[in-house]
Amino acid sequence: MIPPEIRRSVLLQKAIKLALAGTLLTFASFSATAADPSSDTETPQPPDILLGALFNDVQNAKLFPDQKTFADAIPNSDPLMILADYRMQRNQSGFDLRHFVDVNFTLPKAGEKYVPPAGQSLREHIDGLWPVLTRSTKNVKKWDSLLPLPESYVVPGGRFREIYYWDSYFTMLGLAESGHWDKVADMVANFGYEIDAWGHIPNGNRTYYLSHSQPPFFAFMVELLAQHEGDDALKEYLPQLQKEYAYWMEGVETLQPGQQNQRVVKLEDGSVLNRYWDDRDTPRPESWVEDIATAKSNPNRPATEIYRDLRSAAASGWDFSSRWMDNPQQLSTIRTTTIVPVDLNALLYQLEKTLARASAAAGDRAKASQYDALANARQKAIEMHLWNNKEGWYADYDLQNNKIRDQLTAAALFPLYVNAAAKDRAAKVAAAAQAHLLQPGGLATTSVKSGQQWDAPNGWAPLQWVAAEGLQNYGQDDVAMEVTWRFLTNVQHTYDREKKLVEKYDVSSTGTGGGGGEYPLQDGFGWTNGVTLKMLDLICPQEKPCDSVPSTRPASLSATPTKTPSAATQ
């Protein structure tokens, strides 16, 4: 007779083998066509790979209202052992999946609700939030999806418990305005660390975000830090700027006209531009059930294709928007990877210009000239391929149909923001934005009502700032004032009623948070805080700063951009 302890050991070994097989099968079924960087043994695996069938079953059981909850849960022991245990128990009578999860995982804690002191002005409220939103994760538990960072950082707030790439730049604008240059330096250091560790800045510091980046604002961050530290900041982060550029341009050397590789595109005339791309083609762990349902709703397309386009939209920061869809009412028609975004290419133009400046600061004039030439080539490609001459605004290019898209979105302001627009075209964009996107509460993201959060009637703080500063770059101060004043009034009215700043706003009126999307409205909120402080400086004179939005609209903006216009604006 076999002793019970040996029998249990044999059974456990069999279960582990089954668990391993199941994990590999799960990986194969979801990732067969993916060029997955997380397959590298040095790269931590996301929870859907670590936990295989268990992850799929928990998410499909909808144990938690937010799918991000289990994606952020920490296994209490080796995931393979947990998975083996699960395979042994799951078919037993009375098995309780929620109890199993509670025993084997540490779930993320709900953040304590911040109650601000009574009677605070808008500025006082924001200044009081910085320590509330600051986190430190120098050390994380084994198997945690959270990735460690060497310095403290400011999170957006709400369900967003980690650092996010493009959010952080607008948060950093506010930190700098508040005099927290130490926090700005810490966050730039964290992003530099991520570039060194992973070859790029992921969407956020989670394992499940490693397969894509976000709008590339690292150059802006370094330029911001250089305002305080001078050219030393440019020289210090030149290697990381170069690595990020290499990530976005990977594969360009071998491309023939009409070909694409990951994030880079070569058009038929040889112009080189970029697109958003995710290295995986699986459901997103933080939105697992939603992505599976989206793919099932369009059986005429391969599910893996839809998954990659959903992930690539997350990389764009605009998740989700009619901008990426053939049918704005049907998310499964999303095709992000066949669209060349105007805002992404404007940001990469800025990266090239910053690389030129940093190379010059480091004494490498030859490299500086090379990067300037690349920036000039991109600027010409933007003017050639991302300008809709019929409509009179900048737009995205459609690779599938080989033509410029007609839709006007707030992304049209990005060439103005980076000083890459021709002067006459900037004036046309200003007129179009005023006529089609400007609403009582700020600038709408698009004019389409799709139910997605990056569409009408929502307006987002970063896009308000891009618009206001871009319009000022070209002397469109009246429209810039309208965007600034209307959005600030919206923020102030919402704060007066609810005592909080939120992630997005309904700009069809004032005093209402935005809706739509995959999750409830979040408060905090990092980038809204930063943009609000900067906009308060725009409408109030330096000698008499304001702590809240004035009741009377100022006659003109008080501050002007400090950027040096590029040759395109001369």
Swiss-Prot record:
GO terms for molecular function: alpha,alpha-trehalase activity. Residues 1-34 form the signal peptide. Residues 554-570 have a biased composition (Low complexity). Its main location: periplasm. The keyword Hydrolase applies. Residues 544-570 are annotated as: Disordered. Keywords: Glycosidase, Hydrolase, Periplasm, Signal. GO terms for cellular component: periplasmic space. It is found in: Periplasm. Coiled coil: none annotated. The active site is at D319, E503. Provides the cells with the ability to utilize trehalose at high osmolarity by splitting it into glucose molecules that can subsequently be taken up by the phosphotransferase-mediated uptake system. This is Periplasmic trehalase. It comes from Salmonella paratyphi C (strain RKS4594). The gene is treA.
